[in-house]
From Swiss-Prot:
The gene is acpS. One of its GO terms (cellular component) is cytoplasm. This is Holo-[acyl-carrier-protein] synthase. GO terms for biological process: fatty acid biosynthetic process. Its cofactor is Mg(2+).
Amino acid sequence: MIYGIGTDLVDPARIASSLERYGEQFARRVLADSEWPDYLEHIKPALFLAKRFAAKEAFSKATGTGLRAPVMFGNMAVQHDSQGKPYFEFQQELAEWIGQRGITRHHLSISDELTMVSAFVVLEK
């Protein structure tokens, strides 16, 4: 059964502007610690951040809470399986919160073009 769905659109240029203005501080607000090494190695850091930002916003919308504790950027990380499929890893606090709501599976899709990044999340009970 579907618990919730969420979607988000992000303009990578807006993320690039935030990076120029706030630098590493902005990136640290968006990324979980486990995402930091991949960010540092990425040839397009603004695009990397835009994808994470969109995915995490879409997840927050699927929960129905928006971004409020424990559904926070730092409590979730976007990873990829061996085939390149994206998925979330959750910090313990958020994982417990998800379990309390009976959410058993999640699905994440991320797409990007030159001027837009989109993410779509489905949560199942």
